């Protein structure tokens, strides 16, 4: 599905490397996709434990959709030079709407609880095995003029620099809203791995209906 536009928000540029993240209370692997890149490495990106909890909007506006997002994204690199892999891991949505009444769509995303596990952010062996949950970025907002008609908006809600043969990032109860869209709103979560060489692979989950 072709997106009308794509917005990338870099949130954790200071993190040099991420390693495998811990689980959540939801069910396991949701989807994955692999790609053999130009250096004969197999790049795999996965989504785990995805859960979007749609709630009644606090503004009580029938054109507002509000939800809380929990889940994980993981990547695995196999093949020659896998340990030297460097790139970016993204999480985001494709947002589908049937009608916008000419007022556009506003997307806001706050991240009260991003978890990063086993991140070697200084020098080994410091054993950072505990979960780190700082308020790395309190909120971002994206607006797009969609006109009178259906459409799709793709938004990368956050992006982290990664290195090494495997790693991941998890988010718990991150908050999102879409306003100004009449009718139901569909959210299709995705995870994308982009190598420093430019190769990329994206896995898309099932759509979630935010009625």
UniProtKB/Swiss-Prot annotation:
Protein localization: Cell outer membrane; Secreted, Cell wall
Record's keyword terms, sorted: Cell outer membrane, Cell wall, Ion transport, Iron, Iron transport, Membrane, Porin, Secreted, Signal, Transmembrane, Transmembrane beta strand, Transport
Signal peptide region: 1-27
InterPro entries: Leukocidin/porin_MspA_sf, Porin_fam_mycobact-type
Molecular function GO labels: porin activity
Null mutant phenotype: Single deletion has decreased permeability to the antibiotic cephaloridine (9-fold), glucose (4-fold), serine, phosphate and iron Fe(3+). Growth rates are wild-type, due to the other Msp-type porins. A double mspA-mspC deletion takes up less cephaloridine, glucose, serine and phosphate than the single mspA deletion and grows slower than wt or single mspA deletion. A triple mspA-mspC-mspD deletion grows even slower and has reduced Fe(3+) transport compared to wild-type.
GO biological process: iron ion transport
Cellular compartments per GO CC: cell outer membrane; extracellular region; pore complex
Induction remarks: Constitutively expressed.
Gene3D superfamilies for the chain: Porin MspA (Ig-like beta-sandwich domain), Porin MspA ribbon domain
Main localization of the protein described in the UniProt heading: membrane
Family listed: Belongs to the mycobacterial porin (TC 1.B.24) family.
Domain notes: The rim domain (28-96 and 152-211) is accessible from the external milieu and is partially embedded in the outer membrane. The stem domain (131-148) is inaccessible from the outside and embedded in the outer membrane, while loop 6 (121-127) is thought to be in the periplasm.
Main function: The major porin in this organism, forms a water-filled channel which favors the permeation of cations, amino acids, iron Fe(3+) and less efficiently phosphate. Does not transport Fe-ExoMS, the predominant siderophore. Plays a role in transport of beta-lactamase and hydrophilic fluoroquinolone antibiotics such as norfloxacin as well as chloramphenicol. There are about 2400 porins in wild-type, 800 in an mspA deletion and 150 in a double mspA-mspC deletion.
Oligomer and partners: Forms very stable octamers. Isolated as a 100 kDa complex that can be reduced to monomers upon boiling in 80% dimethyl sulfoxide for 15 minutes. Structures show a goblet with the wide end on the exterior of the outer membrane and a central channel. It is not known if mixed oligomers of MspA with other Msp subunits form in vivo.
Protein name listed in UniProt: Porin MspA
Organism from which the protein derives: Mycolicibacterium smegmatis (strain ATCC 700084 / mc(2)155)
Classification of source organism: Bacteria, Bacillati, Actinomycetota, Actinomycetes, Mycobacteriales
Gene that encodes the chain: mspA
